Amino acid sequence: MTTTISSNLPSQLEISPTKLLITKQPIKLRESTESPFKSMMDTFKNTIISTSPTECEESSSSTITTPSEESLSSGEESSSISDSESKIITIATLLKPSNSVQDFTPLCNGAQETEIVKISNSINLSNFIIKHLVGKGGFGKVFQVVHVDTQKVYALKVIKKNHIIAKKSVVNTLAEKDILKKISHPFIVNLHYAFQNEKKLYLVMDFVNGGQLFYHLQKEAIFSEDQVRFYMAELILALEHLHDSNIVHRDLKPENILLDSQGHCILTDFGLAKLEVKTNNETFSFAGTLEYMAPEMIQHATCGKAVDWWSIGILMYDMMIGKPPFEHKNRALMQEKIISEKAKFPKFVSSSARSLINGLLTKDPTKRLGANGAIEIKRHPFFKSIQWRKIENKEITPPFVPSTKGIDDISNFDHASLKAHQRDSFSTSPTLSSSQQAYFDGFSFVRTPVLLESQK
């Protein structure tokens, strides 16, 4: 179903543009030698931007120690408090009368030439209350938030501009927003809002409270064959929809699959996804998680949509056996195993499951199961009991329902690992040049109520 996204924004959300003072002093962006999936870029030491008095106040939440927007920029760490003393971080209002603007002036020694860059948002951080930190990655952080007016619960993904510029990931980040803006599918996360300030990008998406598939796989070690069949069916439908739109995900793994409160799969994290993949002769950069990466990507050969079918084959093996089929502490040796070795199976894996996994893990992408479309996979004997239309309409009861106590419940998220990452990776952000800010022109987005209704 084709859905039209209206660019008309609700009048009650209109605010005056923010005025920024941007220095013309050259800024050197230093490339990090660390993995983009393991670290953030080093601290910029040249320039400090003063924050407005209306920046968010530091507070804390009852379950997870959560930094406010100020601590997201400054690196300060919130203190834990008991449930009886719990507070919700309230974002101080940034809304101004239509004839006023807000200045962010660099603190520099001596006179310095500046120019004015305007960032206009119809919605901003003041429209949300931050409650909990629920995710952490190389891109930044994900928070559970509540919309002030509607009281709806969302997930807020925070991305640092200087980080993605340094990592040369601007195109991927903008592609993530564009993909989520155009895609509507029951097993793919929805984007509701996108906005920015002078330092960061913000994506407001569905809050999916069942937790990561990875979290549940860690707890259970392995899933039953029926459970794997159900998850595979939903994910195949999600990938089929993406591929029909010429989109390749490129980072399919348990961490990027969420379970909703009913137990359905939700595919998320499109930070490495590629748009306009129409042939099998595309050139993909070496990106993704190595254990799930297709041989043709490792060999820097031409690639296509079949890279996702390889990844889902690895995922199926992981769910059934409890680990990926090709592992090694040495990354070079792991790459060699992926390129040359065959998957080995324990005796308890059924013949139909083995056949499906082997088909998906065919080294030659032109002969891989799914190379001619998802219909090849859907017709495999492993799925003979699956009623695809009922799966897509969510008419089949999921084999596992996560325990939740409400839409804002965060009990299915890994609290311990998140608490270890409360502090932001650096205390100051650099001043971006006007040409760098121009990368993000047109980033803001509001999904219209009409479009939201069409997704129900």
From Swiss-Prot:
Ligand binding (ATP): 134-142, 157
Entry GO CC: cytoplasm
Pfam families: Pkinase
Keywords attached to this entry: ATP-binding, Kinase, Nucleotide-binding, Phosphoprotein, Serine/threonine-protein kinase, Transferase
Region (Disordered): 50-84
Protein kinase domain location: 128-383
Low complexity composition-biased segments: 50-83
InterPro entries given in the database record: AGC-kinase_C, Kinase-like_dom_sf, Prot_kinase_dom, Protein_kinase_ATP_BS, Ser/Thr_kinase_AS, STKc_AGC
Top EC class, one word: transferase
Catalytic activity line of the entry: L-seryl-[protein] + ATP = O-phospho-L-seryl-[protein] + ADP + H(+); L-threonyl-[protein] + ATP = O-phospho-L-threonyl-[protein] + ADP + H(+)
Protein name: Probable serine/threonine-protein kinase DDB_G0277449
Organism: Dictyostelium discoideum (Social amoeba)
